Design a protein with these regions (language model features):
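ATPase nucleotide-binding head domains, primarily ABC-like/P-loop NTPase cores
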Residues: 58-59, 243, 362, 368-590
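Alpha-helical coupling/stalk and coiled-coil linker elements that connect catalytic or binding modules
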Residues: 1-418, 425-455, 477-478
Length: 590
């Protein structure tokens, strides 16, 4: 950060000195033009026109250093954000709240999207399409060993290139775009050409240019009067206004949105210049191809064409150029020609950069956690084994890490324990790390090996007034969904917290026994947390397929303490009555 701040100070100094030089040159050029006006073109050129040319060059340098200043400010900002994120303040990053879906198989239960979510912790995307790609990976994790391993390779490769990742992010952040922009750009790329389809309109700019310069030449030679040449010019100016409405519509609808193309061009150029090693990144790089030029050159060409069209807002220049060469129509023709050549390329390039942007987010996550490991992915037979699993969003100085061992199919872990002892946190820890493993990201564990079955959870089912749906019915719907998927032959990894919470104790117990037995017969795997200690007796019926673990609450010297360490067996201590007494609520024993 200190090095970048020094560069920023240097950029600000250059901007100041260039501003001063521009002012001196402008004043000097005007003064020289007045002084040497009567001394002929040679003196005028030397003392007035040349300073104007130098002034224009300085304007370009000024723009460069303004961009450099913004770039450096943004670089300092993102590094400060990363420092805050190391202290578990990741409020600077987009939380993806628009992706929250209460009916999703696991994202709501695991706090994947929304405020203080896993997505917000990991998300470093700088393009709208990159954010959508990253969200889609969280919404639909991979279930194939080879696909996960290829993604692991790509993430690991990018995690070692901090400069590339920061450049991709910085370039994206300098453009203030909206998610809809890329969608509308794709719509424009796939829309038919209007002007180039009409032969008369195609030849019109050339014809107007020839007629104008012919009239100017004839006027100089004295064959026709200057007023005739001027009349022709004015006529063409008026004629050009016929096309203004359609061109204005194109400019207002897509012009601002296409400004993002300069960002994509820079990001594409960076990627073209980078040597890729992993299978996925090499494949993505091959998508950035074009017919006779590089993808970055093609995108930059379109960006320049759109910027040139934007100059029509300068009425004086646009009036002169339209009258002389039908400049606006000529520019639109060039833009449509570009579209005809690259209509199928542009959406592919945008998608590719978005995907690379998403990979950079996961690579930054890996870079920020050098002690995290990439899990081993098993090809056959479900099992899940891990040592020292921790939740990524928990303070590493306070997090108590636990393991898991599901060694065969079917197999269920039943977890019992007191309130606040750590059951629900453990379920989310397993679920989040399982999800990270299945999207190819590193996990917080000493060792982890998984078979990637589809994850399904039921941890925080809620009622719905809008759908006239009770809490209990909502939970039954989720359980029915799980059963339907199993009957359809899908392989699942199931995580449930307190089954059938919305009914009475006896009914709940009976239903829980029946559900777990059904899971056994359907050959599936998972974890169930419960307060019902009798569920622990199921191990007698399925000694090879069920294992009991617990989180205990210890009462010492009239104080409640938690170790948050998972132990073998069924919980022995409960704490509800103790907590009620501590809060002054009378507990009467019969």
């Amino acid at each position: 950060i200190q090095k970048t701040e020094l560069e920023l100070q240097n950029a600000r100094k250059r901007i100041y000195y260039i501003s001063l030089l521009r002012l001196i040159l402008f004043v000097g050029a005007v003064a020289n033009a007045i002084i040497f006006w009567s001394d002929g073109w040679l003196c005028l050129s030397a003392f007035a026109i040349l300073p104007f040319i130098l002034f224009i060059w300085l304007v370009k340098r000024h723009n460069f250093w303004f961009y450099r200043k913004d770039f450096l400010k943004k670089k300092i900002e993102i590094n400060e954000q990363e420092l805050r994120a190391m202290q578990y303040d990741f409020s600077d990053f987009d939380d993806g709240k628009e992706f929250v879906n209460p009916s999703h198989l696991y994202t709501l239960d695991l706090d994947v999207f929304g405020e203080h979510s896993l997505f917000q912790y990991i998300n470093r995307t700088a393009t709208p399409i990159g954010k959508q790609h990253l969200a889609s990976w969280f919404n639909a994790h991979l279930e194939n060993k080879e696909a996960i391993e290829h993604r692991q390779e790509a993430i690991h490769e990018l995690s070692t290139d901090l400069e590339y990742r920061q450049q991709i992010r910085l370039l994206g952040l300098l453009y203030k775009g909206k998610p809809a922009d890329t969608t509308e750009i794709k719509e424009w790329a796939n829309s038919p050409s209007y002007y180039r389809k009409r032969t008369l309109l195609r030849i019109l700019p050339t014809a107007v240019t020839i007629i104008n310069f012919l009239c100017i030449g004839l006027a100089i030679l004295g064959i026709i009067s200057a007023s005739i040449a001027g009349g022709v010019f004015v006529g063409f100016v008026l004629f050009s206004t016929i096309f203004s409405k359609g061109i204005t519509k194109l400019q207002t609808t897509y012009g601002e949105k296409l400004q993002i193309l300069s960002t994509y061009a820079d990001q594409i150029l960076l990627t073209e210049q980078k040597e890729m090693q992993s299978h996925i990144l090499q494949k993505l790089k091959t998508e950035l191809t074009s017919q006779n030029q590089t993808a970055s050159q093609a995108v930059r060409q379109l960006s320049k064409l759109m910027n040139a069209l934007d100059q029509r807002s300068n009425l004086l220049i646009s009036t002169i150029l339209n009258g002389l060469i039908f400049w606006e129509l000529r520019q639109v023709m060039r833009i449509e020609k570009w579209k005809e050549i690259h209509a199928s390329d542009l959406p592919r390039w945008i998608e590719t950069i978005g995907e690379i942007d998403a990979y950079c987010s996961l690579a930054t996550f890996a870079y920020n956690h050098p002690d995290y490991i990439y899990p081993t992915i098993a090809a056959q037979s479900f099992h899940l084994q891990a040592e020292a699993l921790g939740h990524p969003l928990m303070d590493r100085n306070k997090c108590v890490r636990n393991g898991i061992d599901i060694e065969r199919r079917p197999f269920f872990i039943i977890i019992t324990g007191a309130n606040m002892a750590g059951k629900s946190t453990y379920l989310r820890t397993v679920g989040v790390n399982y999800l990270l493993a299945c999207i190819g990201a590193p996990v917080w564990a000493k060792r982890m090996e998984i078979y990637p079955a589809r994850l399904v959870t039921s941890l925080r089912t809620s009622d719905s007034l809008a759908d006239n749906e009770s809490y209990f019915f909502a939970e039954l719907k989720r359980l029915k969904l799980i059963i339907d998927k199993l009957e359809a032959g899908e392989e699942l990894f199931i995580i449930l917290d307190e089954i059938l919470k919305g009914t009475n104790s006896m009914d709940k117990q009976k239903g829980s026994f029946a559900l777990i037995k059904q899971f056994m017969h359907m050959n599936t795997n998972g974890i169930i947390a419960t307060h019902d200690l009798l569920l622990g007796t199921l191990v007698d019926s399925f000694p090879q397929n069920i294992r009991n673990y617990c989180f205990e609450a210890d009462i010492t010297n009239n104080e409640l303490t938690f170790s948050y360490q998972m132990r073998n067996g069924v919980a022995q201590n409960m704490n509800a009555c103790f907590l009620m007494k501590k809060m002054g609520i009378a507990v009467i024993n019969d």
